[in-house]
C-alpha cells in the first residue's frame, strides 16, 4: 500500500465531493459484472443478470453499488488506516463470502474508468494516479484477512 501525500489526499477528497455515490456505485458494480462475468457468481440473489441491460438496470446491483461506494467514502476519510477501516469487511468477504481478492482490484479499476468517463478532462493523469493509488490501497486492505 502506497503512502498518500497531502496532494493525493486533497486530489482524492476534492473529486470524491463531486461523485454521485448512487449513480457511480451502480455503474461501477454493473460494469464489473458485465466486463468480468465470472464475478456474477457472488450475486446469485440479485435476480436477472442475463445481459448487460438487465445488469445495468437491476435495482439490487444499483443498491449494492451504492453500498460499496459508501464504504469507499469511509476509506477516503481514513486514508492513513485503510487496513483498519476495512478489517471487518475483509473478514466478511474472506471467511463468509469467499470472494476472490483479485475482484477488489478489478472493482477499483472499473471505478477509475467510471470516474474518467464522468469527469472527462477534469480526470487528469495526476488525478488518475492518486485514485489508482487509493483503489490499490483499498484492494490491499480488503485482501488483508485472507490466508
UniProtKB/Swiss-Prot annotation:
The keyword tRNA processing does not apply. Keywords: Heme, Iron, Metal-binding, Oxygen transport, Transport. GO terms for molecular function: haptoglobin binding; heme binding; hemoglobin alpha binding; metal ion binding; organic acid binding; oxygen binding; oxygen carrier activity; peroxidase activity. One of its GO terms (cellular component) is blood microparticle. InterPro entries: Globin (IPR000971), Globin-like_sf (IPR009050), Globin/Proto (IPR012292), Hemoglobin_b (IPR002337), Hemoglobin_oxygen_transport (IPR050056). Heme b binds at residues 64, 93. Red blood cells. PROSITE patterns: GLOBIN. GO terms for biological process: hydrogen peroxide catabolic process. Residues 3-147 form the Globin domain. Disulfide bonds: none annotated. Belongs to the globin family. Heterotetramer of two alpha chains and two gamma chains in fetal hemoglobin (Hb F). Gamma chains make up the fetal hemoglobin F, in combination with alpha chains. This is Hemoglobin subunit gamma. It comes from Papio cynocephalus (Yellow baboon).
